[in-house]
Amino acid sequence: MILLKLYLTLAAILCQSRGTTSLDLDDLMTTNPEIQNEIINKHNDLRRTVDPPAKNTLKMSWDNTIAESAKRAALRCNQNEHTPVSGRTIGGVVCGENYFMSSNLRTWSFGIQSWFDERNYFKFGFGPTRAGVMVGHYTQVVWYKSYKMGCAINLCPNEPLKYFLVCQYCPGGNVVGR
């Protein structure tokens, strides 16, 4: 019995120390300037860690028009295909797009980090390190010419991965040969 109490106490402490808190969808809405700053700071922090170091990467900034476009994409709940180019062309500029889907609500930092972690399968100057791996999210996050972005989140209750995070980046990246 003493071991059970000790185990439960340790489990409670570990959950608290790992920052396990209940998230609410409203806590992650990108209309909140604090969330916008979290997203921008996470992107800029990760972009600074690119290896080899990039000399000409532009700093990301938030753009409300792009965020509205990302919101339209998130509201579609179409997790199988990206927004058509015509739906993510803003001011004549084609924007790139990343999706993150999850059955559990995750923070923006978690989703952005998951995109960035595709770097493990990418080699600069070569591309994907093996067939079938995803690296396009990573390359869009670090694309040197992208400097404006906006993101949105939506609950898609009829999807198995019901939480849908979308970021759009302008100008878009992933241009073959660059």
Swiss-Prot record:
It is found in: Secreted. Expressed by the venom gland. Keywords: Calcium channel impairing toxin, Disulfide bond, Ion channel impairing toxin, Neurotoxin, Potassium channel impairing toxin, Secreted, Signal, Toxin. Disulfide bonds join 77-156, 95-170, 151-167. Residues 1-22 form the signal peptide. Belongs to the CRISP family. This is Cysteine-rich venom protein VAR3. It comes from Varanus acanthurus (Ridge-tailed monitor).
